[in-house]
Amino acid sequence: MQDYKQQFKNKKITIMGLGILGRGLGYTKFLAECGAELTVTDLKSEEQLVTSIKELKKFTSASKDLAEIKFVLGEHRLEDFKDRDMVIKAAGVPLDSIYIKEAQKNKIPVEMDVSLFLKCAPEVTIIGVTGTRGKSMVTVLVYEILKQNEKFLKNPSTTLRTKKPSVFLGGNVRGIATLPLLKKVKVGDILICELDSWQLQGFGDSKISPHISVFTSFMPDHMNYYKNSMKKYFEDKANIFKYQKKNDILIIRPDVKKLIPKNLESKLIVVKPDNFQEENLACAVEVAKLLKIPNKNIKKALKNFKGLEGRLQYVKTIKGVKIYNDNNATTPEATMAGIEALSISFPEAQLRGVSPKLGFGERKIVLICGGADKKLPLDDFVKVVNKYCKAVIMIPGTGTDKLVSSGNVLVTSKYVKNLNEAVKAALGLASRGDIILFSPAFASFGQFNNEYERGDLFMKIIKNSK
């Protein structure tokens, strides 16, 4: 492998999509450090990206060795996709983007953060996790188990047996850019990546798959992006295993098995516990066992696992009303799972993978939902809402409009102007012993820059509520 800096030094690189989540910022800084000549282009305005832009300008001005970054904001230009050495695109760039087609026409490599890292990295073990639901939990669980047990890991390199592998986290994780990990990783290290369908596009373009892959679930999502084609959606997801080799491993939940080709090159492991969270838990445990982590250490890590922010996260209790943040539930299916988990069993049991033992019985959930339509069906969602929810508070969005116009929500419902009003309305409707569940069921765009901004606002509102 070449020195990573030399691979980017003096290269003319267009970064398509800076964003405000930290990933684009992270690899833009890294490439600037490597001496690349950078053009950053984003459809968002300078005002929308002000935090990221200020940080980059401060970063480059702090060293005379770093070239100034050129910004093209509020638009993309074809000229920025010509006469370049590389284009790095962010997740979610349209499949039919004329700018990507322009780069391809000019034989300019189009890369993505994680797949580009793999091309440049030394020999490291890649553990990739994908799935419409469950991938975030499995990714973090695997990382926590391995990070807490690095001393038990063995280096596969025959020349570095005495060096214990280090464990890193990357992929679709808030605030983490994978490419800059090139500064830290060594031969034999382990990288655990959460991989959404967009990042797996990059794997497909590069014809690579992780050494250990986990595929948790597959159901409709991002149909606005894939233009209602489940086939195209699956084609991207399938890159998690498509290019695996004979000694690689694919771990799946049972309902994914029907999607896996019979001529699979790698070894297939199907987990078989009882419920959704247990299956996700079993996937993480299977990875840990493959890497020879002792069972007692796995159990200890699971016991200490506190769950994930924005995923059925218990926040606080106000006047006897428990409040949960399920902000990352951006599909009807995901919100249905949250409603059922809180209605059928205690969430703590679900997160620990413990079989349900006690149900709440009557309807006690006041649901806050709403947002932008992702072109997904709502029939089953409405049935679950009517069965388990006491009331529904809806925030604005095209998906909300679709839900309201259906006229099928039979429980008490209220349409409000914003999230702040939604929380006030929910607290007004909830009684001692009830649950307020913030689980949008729809995307965040239109009202927020991204789902994290929406989740942060909800947490801030709840923090200030009494």
Task: State what each model feature region is.
Residues 60-66, 158-162, 348-362:
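Short Gly/Ser/Thr- and charged-rich N-terminal loops/segments
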Residues 36-44, 250-254, 366-370, 388-397:
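Short internal beta-strands
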Residues 1-112, 116, 147, 293, ...:
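N-terminal leader/targeting and accessory segments in enzymes
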Residues 33, 78-82, 91-248, 258-267, ...:
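Phosphate-binding loop of NTP-binding sites
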Residues 31, 87, 110, 129, ...:
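Residue-level signal for inorganic ion chemistry
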Residues 49-57, 378-434:
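C-terminal helical cap/extension that packs against the catalytic core
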Residues 2-12, 27-34, 274-390:
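Nucleotide phosphate-binding/pyrophosphate-handling subdomain across enzymes
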Residues 38-42, 168-169, 192, 438:
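Short beta-strand "acidic-cap" motif of Rossmann-like dinucleotide-binding folds
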